[in-house]
Amino acid sequence: MRVAVGAAFFLSSADGVRIMATAVWDDDTTGRKDGFWASGHVPTLIAAFLYFDLAFMVWVLLGPLAPDIARSLALTPAEKGLMVAVPTLAGALLRLVNGLLVDRIGPKRSGTISQLIVIGGLASAWMMGVNSFGATLALGVILGFAGASFAIALPLASRWYPPEHQGKAMGLAGMGNSGTVLAALFAPTLAKLFGWNAVLGLACIPLTLVLIAYQIMAKDAPGAPPAKSLGAYFTPLKTADAWWLMGFYAVTFGGFVGLAASLPIYFTDRFGLSTITAGYCTAACVFAGSLVRPMGGALADRVGGVKALTAVFIVAAVALAGVGGASSVEAALALFVLAMLALGTGNGAVFQLVPQRFSAEIGVMTGLVGMAGGFGGFYLASSLGLAKQLTGSFSSGFLIFAALAIVALVGLMLVKGHWRRTWTAAAGVRI
């Protein structure tokens, strides 16, 4: 016999498949908790990863294509920076919308709507052409729907898993950040073979295939909270904890996605690399950050999100400050990999903390925190382009963002004691 802690419950289907809502399950005779893979719904976790992965691939698609687009449209450094930053800003704003949709119509339907919009936008851009700077910005807004997938994929996966496995579940689903690797690896080569505009149409093929798999595999978790009034969704913003978590994610995820979008431009402009070589360098950096995201969640489960973030902010600040003075592509690449390892770990660590404090508002908090991360990415990507145009160098942009990581570290030191005293963590969960 199983006993549910809280309001969650088990369902057993005719074929014996066990379905679990977001809860801690204890065996009332042994006190044992289910292992990670047995405690949730693995097909949904896989579907969330695939959906997130391909969405992130197209979200940053303008980054690897930026050198080719800039040459074709004669863009300035500031315009290049803004072009790759707009999808990040649009994604930030749309994440809040998706967070609201998730709690009202469920993550599966929300994801379907968002993916159809992205596929339609890319197909239209491919057929009609992108012939001006304004058109690139309009396309960037459409690609923002792909970035907003964050607020869908994570609740889709996390609602199936108990508190002690939240870091792993959200880390594995969030490993869809690796989609940025696919964009960096393949977009420049495809652009060389077929032209950069054709890449927009080619991207629709894997998006459609994954959407089909998503429809088959993904299931909304039972026992989802009832829809609240619109005003109730913004209740978390009345608490300082929400703003702190948003600020921390603006640094970790903002740094990750801002670099993913900007590094192709950096490597081509700073060191004169070809677009394909710059894509390989970017892919190496992004892969490092994506790989450690689930490890960051698992690390936070083990030692606590606060300790994990402390190390993250220190390493990220040192690495990004070092990039400002890097004189060779090898040194810059090594420092970017180090920075991305730290930032990827931080992404997982922040989302280990979010459900511990806001379990009842996980949908909207995912949207709010993700929105803040998008704002951070927009700032980094746009400021790097502006710094290049005004000073002739990217260095000041990296130094300012390194300083923001130090500010986040100071903030974390200020709130960690209060969090540990006042948050009520589930048994076995560290803060």
Predicted regions and their residues:
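C-terminal transmembrane helical hairpin of 12-TM major facilitator-type secondary transporters
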Residues: V303-V350
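Symmetry-related core transmembrane helices of the 12-TM Major Facilitator Superfamily/SLC fold
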Residues: A198-Q215, S396-L414
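Helix-loop-helix hairpin linking two adjacent transmembrane segments in secondary transporters
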Residues: L172-A218
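Primarily marks hydrophobic transmembrane alpha-helices of the MFS/SLC 12-helix fold
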Residues: K108-G111, L309
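C-terminal ends and interior cores of transmembrane alpha-helices
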Residues: L116-V130, V315-S327
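Cytoplasmic helix-loop-helix junction between adjacent transmembrane helices
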Residues: L139-G176
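Extracytoplasmic gate region of multi-pass secondary transporters
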Residues: L62-P67, A240-P294
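Hydrophobic core of transmembrane alpha-helices in multi-pass small-molecule transporters
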Residues: G134-A148, A250, A331-T345
